[in-house]
């Protein structure tokens, strides 16, 4: 079965929350007459997730992509603004910038497979408005360094936490370092509602704007129609009560999920230490999610030989998350030639980020909690794997590496 750890632990808790919604007969967040829209499953999820991560506010959405758009809108990112984002990420981190009529500026990663803070300042121009660090594969970015740069240049920071729900950096939850955090509850994420997401922040104005953008302009106090009292032009990105029910049950399981993943990853990793020609990606903080173990080979040739024998692929060739494979970005395939992204003088091309290319040609993902061929992680273990199963997977990987 493919999916994230949350999809492996569905049980009675999710069923109970779902049946509550079915029996109430109100699937819409505001669907119970006379009941405040902040009393249902979605609202309870927002409250409990905010408490767990340390946000003052959480806004539930229908997708991580929607979460990113709401964050950009809340900050007023728009026509011709430049936003710095790594070249190794899911396409939504880049495409949402374009959707807001802004210009993505692609940045190099380092051997943590997250944005390299030392390469950010050289990309800043008078048009730069924000940085989007992506906590890729559940590994926190170096947020202290990134925040120093942002403060120095008066830039906003949107943390893309879509693959890192519950991760921490230096004791502080990912998503709480910057101005806003965007999170995903997709099936391949740490916890899941199939599709879904949320925005986290603590600033009142940003909260009101993010909420309004995701709910047709309504303010968070929405009760019925608010003619003359809307905060911003928005669209519909709301989460429904069925998704909210699953999100609530999964949120309550998140601490246990993370603890289990970290323990199982540590066991797998301990048996692969000290092998010739290979190490691991740098983990910026042990508060990472533990969803994947990334092998980093000394050479592209060794990585390719390993993949051939293991029946997998290096990250560079896994498909979904590498800028080289995003032809609609590279070729500026916007829905109209009048789009500022299409007209901007900035060009995009394969291999424009040589450091990123080199790292990803040598990197191989082994699943721990996220089983996803799109991440190059179709082989490995999952959250329910036993000690014996983990030992066997480790032995198989060792045998292949030693035979290279």
PLM regions with names:
Residues 26-35, 39-82, 96-98, 106, ...:
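Phosphate-binding glycine-rich loop
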Residues 73-161, 168:
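PLP-dependent aminotransferase-like
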Residues 280-351:
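Conserved PLP-binding catalytic core of the aspartate aminotransferase-like
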Residues 332-404:
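PLP-dependent enzyme catalytic core of the Aspartate aminotransferase-like
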